[in-house]
Amino acid sequence: MVNQKIQLICETESAVQFTALCQQKGLIHDPNSYLALVQTKVEGQVRLELRKLDEPKLGAVYVDFVTGTMAHRRKFGGGRAEAVAKAVGIKGNYLPTVIDATAGLGRDAFVLAALGCKVRLVERHPVVHLLLQDGLKRAYADAEIGTMMQANMQLLDIAHIQELNSSEEGADVVYLDPMYPHKQKSALVKKEMRIFQHLIGADLDADMLLEPALLLAQKRAVVKRPDYADFLAKKTPHFSHQTKNHRFDIYLKT
């Protein structure tokens, strides 16, 4: 069970709603925590942020599908040539349904959704779940991508894919990208990873995700790994797609 104690800070006038949201996810305010979930307002929009208070230079982690990096990736990224698109098997008119069982900040899921895949997301850590839920809420209301997002990206109110019924709630593809201990030299590359390591740590029970993923997947399970990582659950995939720093291991449904 992850530690759900975190400093809870409200910088808006919606303290009652923020408190209720945190209580719903079982978050406990810890005034001594260096990690803080913050409700703030930026350019007139209320959003949730994760901050590491003892390292303010890291900035905040939040989910934004409308502007910034994700908007640029949607408009000018590789599209169907993106590694994740190839890994899930997008080809011609075939757009698989996908369950992203370790959704995180929803970035890979967003790439697939923007290409037309129907993606259901599962995120078990309550703080990350709230960040993702908040980002989706703002995206659903956006004039440009709102309709697409509502149709193609759905965050499920469950903590683990084992809660899904494989016969009724499966998908063509189940996608896994569990947290993995970073090499020391790469630990500072991304602020999100540094803050996430403090919040979540490594996914020590990640191996237990593969079996339920294979049960839910109707065609394949895809596991994203750092290029130096072992196969998940020590299970050899049918084949892999290699990128500069990562590897997509593909397990076909037999």
Curated annotation (Swiss-Prot):
Subcellular locations according to the entry: Cytoplasm
Keywords of the record: Cytoplasm, Methyltransferase, rRNA processing, S-adenosyl-L-methionine, Transferase
One annotated Gene Ontology cellular component of this protein: cytoplasm
Gene3D superfamilies, sorted: Vaccinia Virus protein VP39, YhiQ-like domain
Location, primary (coarse class): cytoplasm
GO MF annotations in UniProt: rRNA (guanine-N2-)-methyltransferase activity
Known catalytic reactions: guanosine(1516) in 16S rRNA + S-adenosyl-L-methionine = N(2)-methylguanosine(1516) in 16S rRNA + S-adenosyl-L-homocysteine + H(+)
Protein family per UniProt: Belongs to the methyltransferase superfamily. RsmJ family.
The name this protein goes by in its record: Ribosomal RNA small subunit methyltransferase J
Lineage: Bacteria, Pseudomonadati, Pseudomonadota, Gammaproteobacteria, Pasteurellales
